[in-house]
């Protein structure tokens, strides 16, 4: 995954030093884009070992419309713990906006269900969009959405996805985001009778935290390995029926994990 290393190197070498909400400081770039052809393998970073279990469970949690960490904690996933309140609540974050976007008249819009139906019935639509950035709810969220809008595109029997990410922690967050949206694209493709096409990752503020520079240098010194292959249970026909056991990763060889502090 040279695309990811190129992003990291660009921020490391040319990024502007900026302050940030956490007080840590960053090296920041703006407006970068990466493309991944999903026929070439599953884009899981190989220059450090990633916890795929967390990525899959978080995505299933989003799709379920959940905003409480109970499900995640029950499955050994702690990535949202730092933002949750004492009851595990996060406010109207991703899952709520994806599945229950509130309307002025008190109704709710299931963006994900509508998206799947539109891909099936009107694949040339230019409105195959899901947004998590609900301005009215942002102040009620434990953490406003970083990956805030994505759009699907159907061409020649293939489904592609473009994500706009307003804020991107290059070292810790971006590898998760790449894998999560690549997997979502594969899942939606399966349930709509399409083949996976490309995942396109477009960034607003992409940054390396200043306390991640040493770790970034270590990762940049490593050579990427061959991408693994993700197998999805072909019997699953609804996006809402997937479980953790429906995914099998084959051939994942990665360099050792590199630890780094999370900026909260």
Swiss-Prot record:
GO MF entries: thymidylate synthase activity
Subcellular location: Cytoplasm
Enzyme class: transferase
Binding positions (dUMP): 21, 126-127, 166-169, 177, 207-209
Pathway info: Pyrimidine metabolism; dTTP biosynthesis
Function: Catalyzes the reductive methylation of 2'-deoxyuridine-5'-monophosphate (dUMP) to 2'-deoxythymidine-5'-monophosphate (dTMP) while utilizing 5,10-methylenetetrahydrofolate (mTHF) as the methyl donor and reductant in the reaction, yielding dihydrofolate (DHF) as a by-product. This enzymatic reaction provides an intracellular de novo source of dTMP, an essential precursor for DNA biosynthesis.
Family assignment from sequence similarity: Belongs to the thymidylate synthase family. Bacterial-type ThyA subfamily.
Name of the molecule in the record: Thymidylate synthase
Organism this protein belongs to: Parvibaculum lavamentivorans (strain DS-1 / DSM 13023 / NCIMB 13966)
